[in-house]
């Protein structure tokens, strides 16, 4: 056995047809000098995936001091990264120290989940008959001459050549597919009895103390919709147990399929080297900074007239569930105040197209008066999806940013001029999807659902049962006992409004 183990090297040189020195040997050789993706003349498929995920969960009773003191500290102590942190582009969305919020003040137990996901996937499939082969193939040429039939120099060699000079993702006219995905998600759940002070005190502070960002905050387009300090709401006053879920999802996906018919390769390969030396974390400057920058000039998705497909999706969802007996006063007193105190936004608020559906102060409603146990679920879903398929045959970016303002005013309810306009505005100047004559498809969906379930025997007001005389017989007494233990009446009301808008522009 020892003789057999020593001999395979010299005693089995391999046949001329299939062995390492035969026609297939040169094809299957794996020790190509420069790199498996850059050296030799072999076809390649390269996939790169970068995934950054941050998840945070807070379970707290927040026994803190005054709200003003809490809002002053977090600024300097949590500066955040330049890409996504509180001071970056997504900071206003994920800012965590809003003082008068029902989840921040008092001692209410809360559970907050925040998730930030940044993912990039790149796939390159190329043959790229680029530049002079001699420079790159000097080493492999004489050392791997190969047979004339199948090897690298034979009929299949030209097919499998891989010597693309600059980089698999940046040089030549290599067909490539690049996907970038940015996902920011925030979910907040509150379970509370809200043992707070008078309603007036709570509603006075939020104005100046929460100016909010221009995009999504309380003073922005979604502020009126997601405002949490409406005084007469059944979930704000008293000590009613409630469960509130809010979810904000911002997602962007970009796909590029291109051959990059741009200028000389040398010019393109010279710039990216020194200007993009490689990230310490993920992006060239910060952990996520350069990855999320959309207007890099030499990027394969920005230069030339490369066909590309960009999808952006913004989803805002709020779900509220109230389980309460509402031991409140007369109905008339509750319905008088909300009218002037909650004017609402023109688009989605109580005075807009969805206001009648979301009005919560209807006096004769079975869920407002008396002490009836009830469960109310409200769900508001605002979604916009934008898809751009373009070759970007436009002029300078500065000229591109001037036109979209007046030419795309948007609808009064949801468009750029309505309550969601600041969030969904599409004419940011340096963005590749904003200017020129790019064909695009825009879908907007607004879904408002309200479900109300009432379990009532309501011993209140005029619904209180009349006193009955004592039973005169055993049979009558048994019938009354059966009626008493029968399941109560359950009334369920569902209302839904769905608005969908689709726009195609060439």
Curated annotation (Swiss-Prot):
Residues 1-470, 485-506 are annotated as: Disordered. InterPro entries: Herpes_LP. Pfam families: Herpes_LP. It is found in: Host nucleus. One of its GO terms (biological process) is DNA-templated viral transcription. Its main location: host cell. Phosphorylated by the cellular protein kinase cdc2. Keywords: Activator, Host nucleus, Host-virus interaction, Phosphoprotein, Transcription, Transcription regulation. One of its GO terms (molecular function) is transcription coactivator activity. GO terms for cellular component: host cell nucleus; host cell PML body. Plays an important role in the establishment of B-cell immortalization by acting as an EBNA2 coactivator. This transcriptional activation preferentially enhances the expression of the major viral protein LMP1. The interaction between EBNA-LP and host SP100 correlates with coactivation of EBNA2 and the relocalization of SP100 from PML nuclear bodies into nucleoplasm. Homooligomer. Interacts with host SP100; this interaction is important for EBNA-LP coactivator activity. Interacts with host HAX1, ERR1 and HSPA2. Interacts with host PRKDC and AKAP8L; these interactions modulate the coactivator function of EBNA-LP. This is Epstein-Barr nuclear antigen leader protein. The lineage of its organism: Viruses, Duplodnaviria, Heunggongvirae, Peploviricota, Herviviricetes.
């Amino acid at each position: 056995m020892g003789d057999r183990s020593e001999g395979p090297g010299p005693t089995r040189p391999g046949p001329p047809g299939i062995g390492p020195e035969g026609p297939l040997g040169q094809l299957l050789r794996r020790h190509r000098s420069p790199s498996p993706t850059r050296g030799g003349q072999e076809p390649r498929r390269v996939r790169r995936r970068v995934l950054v995920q941050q998840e945070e969960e807070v379970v707290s009773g927040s026994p803190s001091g005054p709200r003003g003191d809490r809002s002053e500290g977090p600024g300097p102590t949590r500066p955040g990264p330049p890409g996504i942190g509180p001071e970056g582009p997504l900071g206003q969305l994920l800012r965590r120290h809003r003082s008068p919020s029902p989840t921040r003040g008092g001692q209410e137990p809360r559970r907050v989940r925040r998730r930030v996901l940044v993912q990039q996937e790149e796939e390159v499939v190329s043959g790229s008959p680029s530049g002079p082969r001699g420079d790159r193939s000097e080493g492999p040429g004489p050392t791997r001459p190969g047979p004339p039939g199948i090897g690298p120099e034979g009929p299949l060699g030209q097919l499998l050549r891989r010597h693309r000079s600059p980089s698999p993702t940046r040089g030549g006219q290599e067909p490539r597919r690049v996907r970038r995905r940015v996902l920011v998600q925030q979910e907040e759940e509150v379970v509370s009895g809200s043992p707070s002070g008078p309603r007036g005190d709570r509603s006075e502070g939020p104005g100046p103390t929460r100016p909010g960002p221009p995009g999504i905050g309380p003073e922005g387009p979604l502020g009126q919709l997601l405002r949490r300090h409406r005084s007469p709401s059944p979930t704000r006053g008293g000590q009613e147990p409630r469960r509130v879920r809010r979810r904000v999802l911002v997602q962007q996906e970009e796909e590029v399929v291109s051959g990059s018919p741009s200028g000389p390769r040398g010019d393109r390969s010279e710039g990216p080297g020194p200007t993009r030396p490689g990230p310490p974390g993920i992006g060239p400057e910060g952990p996520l900074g350069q990855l999320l920058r959309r207007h890099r000039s030499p990027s394969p998705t920005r230069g030339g007239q490369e066909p590309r497909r960009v999808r952006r999706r913004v989803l805002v969802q709020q779900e509220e569930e109230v389980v309460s007996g509402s031991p409140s006063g007369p109905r008339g007193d509750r319905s008088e105040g909300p009218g002037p105190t909650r004017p609402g936004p023109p688009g989605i608020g109580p005075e807009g197209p969805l206001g009648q559906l979301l009005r919560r102060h209807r006096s004769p409603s079975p869920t407002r008066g008396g002490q009836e146990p009830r469960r109310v679920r409200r769900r508001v879903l605002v979604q916009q999806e934008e898809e751009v398929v373009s070759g970007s045959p436009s002029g300078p970016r500065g000229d591109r940013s001037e036109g979209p303002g007046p030419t795309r005013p948007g609808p009064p309810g949801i468009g750029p001029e309505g309550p969601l306009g600041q969030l969904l505005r599409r004419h940011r100047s340096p963005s590749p999807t904003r200017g020129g004559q790019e064909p695009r498809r825009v879908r907007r969906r607004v879904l408002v659902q309200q479900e109300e379930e009432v379990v009532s025997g309501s011993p209140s007001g005029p619904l209180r049962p009349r006193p009955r005389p004592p039973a005169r017989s055993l049979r009558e007494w048994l019938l009354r006992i059966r009626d008493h233990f029968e399941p109560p009446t359950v009334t369920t009301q569902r209302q839904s409004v769905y608005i969908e808008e689709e726009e195609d522009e060439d």
